[in-house]
Amino acid sequence: EIASCLVGSEMCIRDRLGAPLGHDFTVISLSDLLTPWELIERRLAAAAEGDFAICLYNPSSHKRHDYLQKACQILLQKKSGDTICGITRNIGRDGEEKRILTLDELLETQVDMFTTVFIGNSQTRKVGDAMVTPRGYRRDNA
């Protein structure tokens, strides 16, 4: 049996953060164990250039404690510091946490391997305590 981790994760976060991946999005792992960091950097830059909402897995570890900050610096070359972001930690476990913040704030945030990070696109908004990326770019689709 094959189970999709992305679908499971997206379903878990939907109720936690709102609708962070409502339009085109990409999922990028920051782990360089099997993928060279240079390729991860290119993928981050391309996702930012394309105005994708982004989901980041494996954002940090003991050996890669600064990779999220490196990723944020790459994204800030094309995305506004006010871009809405969200983090979830320990989804479905004791101590579950969520937080909505800006890309500038995310740059200064420490996370671990139990954290999933979401970076919105140019249309993503904070609505109450939810992160919402509308399905279309026209304002009447929000």
Regions found by a protein language model. Give the residues of each.
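Short secondary-structure boundary/capping segments
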Residues: 3, 44-45, 108-109
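Short, surface-exposed amphipathic charged segments that create phosphate/polyanion-binding patches used
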Residues: 16-19, 41-44, 98-104
